[in-house]
Amino acid sequence: MSVFQSGFHPEQIAVKIPLWREILLLHELTKLRSDPVFRGNGIPRGNGAAVITIPGFLCSDNYTAYLTKWLNQIGYRAFPSGIEQNNDCIQRALQRLLPTIENAYAETNGKVHLIGHSLGGVLARIAATNHPEKIASIITLGSPFRGIRAHSLILRLSDKARSKIQSDQPHCFTGFCECPSVAALRTALPPEVRHCAIYTKTDGVVDWNACLGDETNHEVKGTHSGLVFSAEVYRLLADWLQ
């Protein structure tokens, strides 16, 4: 993993990756809707545990609605994150996620699984580091929790978002921020929290090397944007959540 051996590297670096491939997410959605896994066939049934889905950068819970609905259908108590649009300061986004975790924990009387796409997975890791007593596991889908290595367009969008939300904090949305959330990324995940990192080597948004965990990693085919619409990912989730 070269520079991604451990910890969270603060520098944002533009990488040359095939952003144009992301349009193929429409094909992935079509394939998912016709796949037996979307109807719950050929996979283990859920055990009623709480699962929270967390959208990626610039996205809302509408983007993960297919996944949330599917999790409910196969036997889990699935909750949207409650973040609204994920384009705010990461510390403030976390503060909106935490009540959802508290609610899911209370309603099911058990630890919660967090499934985060891209930046949503980064938030999941922060939440699990800070509150391991309430988190059973995290599943990250193309989440660059080792450092922001992304297509130049994504970095420009990040810069634009930062200029609007934290003009008084120039390092917001970067690894140089001194907020508690970024500090949590530099801390090892508590051993009692399981972590499954799912990634694709044809990611057109972030460098897939930045998405690898220390233990369980699963490579899938497809796009970054399409990870929440991937039948292959859904099968992995059904097995992992058991």
Positions of PLM-derived features:
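Flexible, membrane-associating and regulatory peripheral segments of lipid-active enzymes
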Residues: 1-52, 59-70, 74, 81, ...
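Alpha/beta hydrolase fold serine-hydrolase catalytic domain that processes acyl esters and thioesters
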Residues: 2-9, 18-21, 159, 168, ...
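Generic detector of well-ordered alpha-helical segments enriched in charged/polar residues
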Residues: 24, 30, 155, 183-186, ...
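Surface-exposed loop/turn and secondary-structure junction residues enriched for glycine/proline
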Residues: 29-35, 41, 60, 86, ...
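Short hydrophobic "helix-edge" motifs at membrane interfaces and signal-peptide entry regions
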Residues: 45-46, 133, 192-194
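Serine-dependent carboxylesterase/thioesterase catalytic core
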Residues: 50-62, 66, 72-189
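C-terminal catalytic-base region of ester-bond hydrolases, centering on the histidine
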Residues: 189-242
